[in-house]
Amino acid sequence: MLGNKLSISDLKDIKNKKVLVRVDFNVPIENGIIKDTNRITATLPTINHLKKEGASKIILISHCGRPDGLRNEKYTLKPVAETLKGLLGEEVLFLNDCVGKEVEDKINAAKENSVILLENLRFHIEEEGKGVDANGNKVKANKEDVEKFQNDLTKLADVFINDAFGTAHRAHSSMVGVKLNVKASGFLMKKELEYFSKALENPQRPLLAILGGAKVSDKIQLIKNLLDKVDRMIIGGGMAYTFKKVLNNMKIGTSLFDEAGSKIVGEIMEKAKAKNVQIFLPVDFKIADNFDNNANTKFVTDEEGIPDNWMGLDAGPKSIENYKDVILTSKTVIWNGPQGVFEMPNFAKGSIECLNLVVEVTKKGAITIVGGGDTASLVEQQNKKNEISHVSTGGGASLELLEGKELPGVLALSNK
C-alpha cells in the first residue's frame, strides 16, 4: 500500500499548473516569533522543485495549533510567511483566509511561479469537522458546510500535493477532501512512505523493534502488530517493569506498574513464542528514591529487585551490554520509545547508549527508523539525526502505521 502511491517525482506535467500543497507548518509561535523552524525548512525541497518545474502558482495550506474552528490571531500563519520569505529569498504572498472568492481572485492575480501561503485551515470548523462556538461550547460542522469547504479548497488549483505526514492519520478536509484528479505525495511524505514500506512490507532481516514508553496498554496494538513482522523485540522503558513483575515476580518498588497492561503480558509472550520472535527485557536498572534528577541513585539487578519506595528510571549497563549483539546483528531496526527518563541527564545513559548502537549498525548498512515523539526528541537532543536512516516527522502517524492501521491521508492519494 505505501509503495504504490503517486509521488511528486512521478508528475511530468506541472508547467503552468496551479499546485495546492498541504504542508505541516504546525510550529511553535510565541508573540509572533517562531521557536523552531524545522518543519518549514523541511518543505523547501518540494517548494523549490515545483518552482523549477514551472508551476504557475504554488499555494501552501496548513493548520497551526488548535484554534477549534474559530479565528484566533494567536495561531495565524503570518509569521511563517516571513520566515519562508527569508528561506526562499523571495516574496511570499500571505492571504488572510484559505477559501472563498477573494482568495481565488488574489491567487489568480498573483504573479506567475509565485509562492502563496493561505491562512490557518483550522480557523474553519469544516477542516476538522468539529470545534467550539464563541461561548466555548463544543459544536460539530454540518455535512453540507464540510462538502462546500472541500469543494472550495479543490477550486484553488489543478494539482494536489500532500506533504503533511504528521497529519496523515487525521481524516481532515484538507487531507482527504480535495477532489482533484492528481493527488501526489511531496518529498517529505514520499520519504516517510518509502522507509516505512521498507521496514513493514519488505524488510531486510533480521528485523528488530526497540520499544519503550510508559504503559503496556498504550502499546498493545503496536506490540501485537509488530510481532507479526519482526524477528526480535527489545521491550524497555517504563513498560518493562510491568513485564518483569508479571514474568519474573520481580520486586519493582514504586516503579510504573500498568494494571490493565499486566493482564496482557502472558498473551504477548505466547504470541511471540508462536511467531518465533525473541523478546529481550532489561536485567538491571538504575533506580532512584525520588522522581528527580538529583535523587539518590544506585544500580540493582532483576534478581535483587527494586526496594520499597525506590523506582527504576533507566536501564542498567548489563542490559545495554545484552542489547549490543541484538542491535548490531540486525539488518532493519524500528525504534519507538526511549529506554529511560532521558529528559533527566542522570537517567539518560541507557537511551543514549542504545542510540549509539543504532547509529553504529546504521554505519554497517542497516536501515534504521526512529518513530516520532520522544525518541525523535532524543535523537535531536544528541544531534544524531543525520546518522540514522530515517527519523519520522509524524509521532501519531508513524505510531498508527506501526500499529498496522491505514492512514486516511495516504489512502486519499492517487495510485501510480
Curated annotation (Swiss-Prot):
Its EC number is 2.7.2.3. CDP binds at residues 213, 218, 237, 337, 342. Its cofactor is Mg(2+). Pfam families: PGK. SUPFAM superfamilies: Phosphoglycerate kinase. GO terms for molecular function: ADP binding; ATP binding; metal ion binding; phosphoglycerate kinase activity. ATP binds at residues 214-215, 219, 238, 312, 375. (2R)-3-phosphoglycerate binds at residues 23-26, 38-39, 62-63, 65-66, 121-122, 169-170. Monomer. PANTHER family: PHOSPHOGLYCERATE KINASE. Belongs to the phosphoglycerate kinase family. This is Phosphoglycerate kinase. It comes from Plasmodium falciparum (isolate 3D7). The gene is PGK.
